[in-house]
């Protein structure tokens, strides 16, 4: 084994401190590998096979056909398996705890990785594993999970996790389903650019800080009550959204470019703390699932081909408002009444249907109502037409996968005031 630091007593103590070990028994010197060590052959791993605990960061790389860590139950440090072009399988079924990270990256023929007893790890990073089909753990505690650019068909190794900081699954083209026991996500939940018909179930999830879903076919959030920051559904093939337990979104709520979405039910949602955007959902003709929303802390934009928009409980919008339907059956009457009562507190109010247009520049008292035409502007000042600028929600990923996005959201148009708020919402989701 090629040690990067000599096994002096000082190095051993330093490695133990860095790993934060709480062992009450001394670790044999042969099991303390210094700050880090690299194994390039199974023979290197066999030298520590008699250890129940190793102290330090272990890297496995080089021309190994298969590799195994026998007997080791704990790594007080990180385990990295990296850039091994011939490694086809790896097993470490005795390991229960890794105090640092488990990193598996750039393993082009690795088909299986087994950590059958692993219950606790700080982070798991699985990136660029183009041949892997199985990954197993007994994971109970982890802070961060990133799975990107793999051929996994399922991620059952994470199915029993209750809490995480980050859960990011992207660009796994064969991944078609995932059922999670997560109850809270303290930073972000992101799912994007996976299989064509991906179905997700997060029915135990009660609280999350941020959620962004892209390229998903079906989603279930049976218990979700609060999203502390932003919630976005972008470029999905979802036929419906049912978040009937959700009562609050602390910042932005975006439902953008979901071409097959025909129903959105948010029947207990009362508060959106930032921008509220429903845009370019071509099959969403009746929008009646937001009838309990009372306050919107930013701008509101609803655009599409809808004939019904029920915001009957809305009392306050602290930004501007843009309602634009291509359907001549949509009526602006209720929204104009909302504006005349002073509920719209931003700098502009625009409401259009297929036949008429009403726009108000709220920094002045001018109001214009006119029949729409193919060439006429919605507002003589031009501010209202700027309010139709679309929201940017282009799909993004953290990997080098060549998979193309299933759809592209409109381009972000820089603007001030009302649209500045809308743009900020979109940028926050990227």
Swiss-Prot record:
Lipidation (GPI-anchor amidated glycine): 407
Keywords: Cell membrane, Cell wall, Cell wall biogenesis/degradation, Glycoprotein, GPI-anchor, Lipoprotein, Membrane, Phosphoprotein, Secreted, Signal
SUPFAM superfamilies xref list: L domain-like
Propeptide residues, chain positions: 408-430
Modification type Phosphoserine: residues: 340
Places the protein is found: Cell membrane; Secreted, Cell wall
Residue ranges, compositional bias (Low complexity): 362-402
Signal peptide: 1-19
Glycosylation sites: 22, 57, 83, 197, 210, 228, 235, 242, 268, 280, 305, 329
Location of the region described as Disordered in the Swiss-Prot/TrEMBL record: 362-411
One record GO biological process: cell wall organization
Membrane topology: Lipid-anchor; GPI-anchor
Cellular-component GO terms for this entry: extracellular region; plasma membrane; side of membrane
PTM characteristics: The GPI-anchor is attached to the protein in the endoplasmic reticulum and serves to target the protein to the cell surface. There, the glucosamine-inositol phospholipid moiety is cleaved off and the GPI-modified mannoprotein is covalently attached via its lipidless GPI glycan remnant to the 1,6-beta-glucan of the outer cell wall layer.
Physiological role: Required for proper cell wall integrity and for the correct assembly of the mannoprotein outer layer of the cell wall. Important for apical bud growth.
Family: Belongs to the SPS2 family.
Stated name of the protein: Cell wall protein ECM33
Organism this protein belongs to: Saccharomyces cerevisiae (strain JAY291)
Gene symbol of the encoding locus: ECM33
């Amino acid at each position: 084994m090629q040690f990067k630091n000599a096994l002096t007593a000082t190095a051993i103590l330093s490695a133990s401190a860095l790993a934060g070990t709480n062992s009450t028994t001394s670790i044999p010197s042969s099991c303390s590998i210094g700050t880090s060590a690299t194994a390039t052959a199974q023979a290197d791993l066999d030298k520590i096979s008699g250890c129940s605990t190793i102290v330090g960061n272990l890297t496995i790389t080089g021309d190994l056909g298969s590799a195994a860590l026998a007997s080791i139950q704990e790594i007080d440090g990180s385990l990295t398996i990296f850039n091994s072009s011939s490694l086809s399988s790896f097993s470490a079924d005795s390991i229960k705890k890794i105090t640092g990270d488990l990193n598996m990256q750039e393993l082009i023929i690795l088909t299986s990785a087994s950590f059958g007893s692993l219950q606790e790890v700080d982070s798991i990073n699985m990136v660029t594993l183009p041949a892997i089909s199985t990954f197993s753990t007994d994971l109970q505690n982890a802070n961060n999970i990133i799975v990107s650019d793999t051929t996994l068909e399922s991620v059952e190794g994470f199915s029993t996790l209750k809490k995480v900081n980050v859960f990011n699954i992207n660009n796994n083209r064969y991944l078609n389903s995932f059922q999670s026991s997560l109850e809270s996500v303290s930073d972000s939940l992101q799912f994007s650019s996976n299989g064509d018909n991906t179905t997700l179930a997060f029915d135990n999830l009660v609280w999350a800080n941020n959620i962004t879903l892209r390229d998903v076919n079906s989603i279930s959030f049976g218990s979700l009550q609060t999203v502390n920051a932003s919630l976005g559904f972008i470029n999905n093939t979802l036929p419906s959204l049912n978040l009937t337990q959700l009562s609050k979104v602390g910042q932005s709520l975006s439902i953008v470019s979901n071409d097959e979405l025909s129903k959105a039910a948010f029947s207990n949602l009362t508060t959106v703390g930032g921008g509220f955007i429903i845009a370019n959902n071509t099959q969403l003709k009746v929008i009646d699932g937001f009838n309990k929303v009372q306050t919107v802390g930013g701008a509101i934009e609803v655009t599409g081909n809808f004939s019904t928009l029920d915001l009957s409980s809305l009392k306050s919008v602290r930004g501007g408002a843009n309602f634009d339907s291509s359907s001549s059956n949509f009526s602006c009457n209720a929204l104009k009444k909302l504006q005349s009562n002073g509920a719209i507190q931003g700098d502009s109010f625009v409401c259009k249907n297929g036949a008429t247009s009403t726009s108000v520049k709220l920094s002045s008292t001018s109001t214009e109502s006119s029949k729409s035409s193919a060439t006429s502007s919605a507002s003589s000042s031009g501010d209202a037409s700027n309010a139709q600028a679309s929201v940017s929600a282009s799909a993004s990923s953290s990997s080098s996968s060549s998979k193309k996005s299933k759809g592209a959201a409109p381009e972000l148009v820089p603007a001030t005031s009302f649209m500045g708020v809308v743009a900020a919402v979109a940028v926050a989701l990227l």
